A protein has these predicted regions:
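Intrinsically disordered, low-complexity regulatory segments
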Residues: 1-178, 378, 468, 507
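Conserved short loop/turn motifs at secondary-structure junctions
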Residues: 2-3, 104-107, 196-198, 287-296, ...
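Basic, low-complexity terminal or inter-domain segments flanking catalytic cores
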Residues: 2-5, 28, 93, 121, ...
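Short active-site loop/helix that positions an aromatic residue
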Residues: 14-22, 116-117, 209-219, 421
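C-terminal or mid-to-C-terminal helical accessory/interaction module adjacent to the motor/catalytic core
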Residues: 74, 87, 96, 139-234, ...
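C-terminal helical "lid" subdomain and adjoining coupling/linker elements of P-loop NTPases
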Residues: 191-200, 211-266, 310, 458-460
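Metal- or metallocofactor-binding catalytic centers and their adjacent structured scaffolds
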Residues: 254-296, 304
Length: 665
């Protein structure tokens, strides 16, 4: 009887698969084995794409005449650092007694690519290959994945998309980086007083750099506009009402106004004060009940954004933490774009909740959900939607592995608690508020106030994080509530005072690592063309698995961005701005979110079988040829000096450090 070989993406995951089998496993160098089963692993990528000089030694030198470089057949090679493990895996894959191969690499595009490259270079033939697709590392889920494993051929479209993504990044990186470095590198190096300067370009990386530079320039060009509002304070409750222009007002359609509730000049606001009378009457009062539903569950981008706000940690650090929590069976698969449950999981979601009932911090809420049966209708709610899931459902707690929590760092347990509370909150009712809107008339002018008064905490009772300091929130006083409850249309009121309050417009906020991750995920919304925006509205820049790494590369490797580690605020460096100028003048479309998102849309279409790999490759090749030839034709390196000089005025002595350390207001 032949053996089954299980191949995982990393040793820790392989151990979890091995532990699932009721077998005595012997440990060998690079694998484990029993009478029926062999378990081995990769170290992430074991195989990579070969550099151009492997095709032709002449390509080692960067010369414009060798571009564009688009090979007919791509070459691959085993990473030198992984050669020993690759040889072990190759030997196991081709062992005569191995009949079945279970592919247990990460359940996603990149995990598929990792195995397909190993398979390709190992020359696997005449073996039954099955794909294990799981959503968590719990024993039950691993066993289900093995039981329901499908022929690897069912994932061929995903494999095609994975290969194309790698070819796209490879070809754009090599061709555009070389072309722009040859054209502009010497001029840039001279300007910066450096020996060399490489213009590093990437499909996603360059677009993200452009977004940060664009935002920084918007902030620089922003001119604050002062405006003046008129505030009246009601007696005796101290309720503040703000004047707004209404039909019948002396200032209706007046050019003196800044929007509908302020003035451009202080003297005009003070003139209004002289028109107002302390005695007023209620013009309108409305009292409505408003509900606020629990937010959708976490996907990776949303969790990374919240962790930046809550803990001031980078998206990369967040991903490392939740990957560890996943491998310790505490959370489901982390690299997901979905924010909902699958209907299959929703049917048995009480199992997760029962597990959490043993967690002291949230046992009260979990037990309440179980006792009241609040989980029973979740399958019919907006929190369950199979149509909004591609590879994996949202990140949720498994309810298992709780014993591992005691040995985890506090930051990890805080992130875990964040996911747990978001998960439990969806089973609770909405929070309820009483919304009161008040319009008071004084000498024909209208002053307004609105309030949201909490009436039922609902799901917010679950969101009481143990790691946050309890702060007394300022709310409306009971005296004010009593006054508002007593008022009706026509009721007389009295103002104790009026004042002019100065304000000013504020510039756009700099991106933090967290807000950039969300901006990358929602890149389709940045597109101005309505038709194109509708076509790719669900596409982002990069993927949930790659976004954090791209930001890290821009900061730590290329030094195109600066990161304030305390606030996680991103700002461009002088080099980053110069590269952006260089790209804008040569291959401007690389800075476009619409182009970058449309490439990602194309990859999704390939993975779904809606576009062939050949069609995609043809479009990619045409794009590279056109733009490389465009760079060849433009002799604009010296012209760029005036842009570099202008950029440098914002990076004088000590100025770059100052900009880097700026915190958000």
């Amino acid at each position: 009887m032949g053996k089954s070989l299980f191949i995982a993406e990393k040793p820790s995951v392989a151990r979890q698969f091995a532990d699932c089998f009721s077998e005595t496993m012997k440990k060998y160098d690079g694998y484990q084995e029993s009478e029926r089963i062999v378990v081995t692993w990769c170290f992430g990528h074991l195989v990579t794409m070969s550099y151009p000089e492997v095709y032709d030694e002449e390509l080692k030198r960067w010369r414009m005449e060798t571009l564009p470089f688009i090979p007919d057949d791509f070459k691959y090679e085993v990473l030198q650092s992984a050669k020993k493990q690759f040889d072990i895996v190759k030997g196991l894959l081709n062992r005569p007694d191995v009949e079945k191969i279970y592919v247990c690499t990460d359940s996603g595009r990149e995990g598929e690519y990792i195995y397909r490259l190993v398979r390709q270079e190992a020359g696997v033939k005449d073996k039954k290959e099955l794909r294990v697709w799981i959503n968590s590392q719990t024993d039950d889920e691993i066993k289900r994945g093995i039981r329901e494993a499908k022929p690897i051929s069912e994932y061929d479209n995903l494999s095609d998309a994975a290969y194309l993504r790698a070819k796209e990044d490879y070809l754009m990186g090599i061709n555009f980086s070389r072309a722009l470095t040859i054209r502009h590198g010497r001029t840039m190096a001279g300007f910066l007083s450096e020996k060399h300067c490489t213009v590093s370009v990437g499909r996603v990386m360059t677009c993200v750099l452009g977004m940060v530079v664009k935002r920084e320039r918007e902030i620089r060009q922003f001119v604050k506009t002062p405006f003046y509002r008129v505030i009246g304070t009601l007696d005796p409750s101290k309720i503040e009402c703000e004047w707004k222009v209404c039909e019948g007002s002396k200032y209706f359609n007046s050019p003196l106004l800044y929007k509908e509730n302020g003035f451009k000049k202080e003297e005009d606001a003070r003139e209004l004060l002289s028109l107002l009378s302390p005695d007023g009457k209620v013009k309108e009062i409305s009292k409505k009940t408003e509900k606020k539903n629990p937010p959708l569950l976490y996907n990776l981008a949303e969790l990374q954004s919240d962790c930046t706000k809550l803990f001031h940690i980078s998206p990369d650090e967040t991903l490392n933490i939740i990957q560890d929590l996943y491998e310790k069976k505490l959370l489901t698969y982390p690299r997901t774009d979905a924010r909902v449950l699958s209907s299959a999981v929703a049917k048995v979601i009480d199992q997760n909740i029962r597990g959490l009932s043993k967690l002291p911090a949230v046992s009260e809420y979990a037990n309440h959900i179980l006792e009241k049966g609040l989980f029973r209708n979740i399958e019919k709610s907006k929190y369950t939607d199979d149509k909004k899931i591609t590879d994996h459902y949202a990140i949720i707690p498994t309810g298992q592995g709780l014993s591992a929590l005691s040995s985890l760092p506090k930051r990890s347990t805080d992130v875990y608690e964040t996911v747990v509370r978001r998960f439990l909150s969806i089973f609770y009712p909405p929070a309820e508020y009483k919304k009161i809107t008040l319009d008071v008339e004084s000498n024909g002018e209208t002053l307004s106030a609105s309030f949201k008064i909490p009436s039922e905490k609902g799901y917010l009772s679950v969101m009481d994080y143990s790691f946050q300091k309890k702060e007394e929130k300022e709310g409306i006083s009971q005296e004010s509530i009593d006054l508002l409850n007593s008022l009706k249309k026509g009721s007389p009121v009295r103002f104790s005072s009026f004042k002019v309050k100065e304000g000013e417009t504020t510039p756009p906020k700099r991106y933090t690592t967290g807000s950039m991750i969300l901006a990358m995920e929602n890149a389709g919304n940045l597109i101005e063309d309505e038709e194109l925006r509708e076509q790719i509205k669900s596409q982002g820049i990069g993927t949930s698995a790659t976004r954090a790494e791209i930001l890290k590369k821009l900061v730590e490797k290329n030094h195109y961005l600066s990161l304030n580690k305390k606030t996680q605020v991103l700002t461009p460096t002088l080099l980053g701005e110069m590269v952006t100028d260089c790209v804008a003048a040569s291959i401007g479309s690389l800075l476009s979110p619409s182009l970058t998102a449309s490439w990602e849309k194309g990859l999704s279409m390939v993975s779904e079988g809606e576009l062939s790999a050949d069609e995609y490759m043809k479009k990619l090749s045409d794009f590279i040829v056109k733009n490389v030839n465009g760079v060849k034709e433009k002799q604009n390196s010296l012209e760029m000096l005036r842009f570099y000089k202008f950029d440098s005025t914002f990076y004088g002595k000590g100025k770059e450090k100052k900009e880097e350390d700026k915190e958000e207001d």
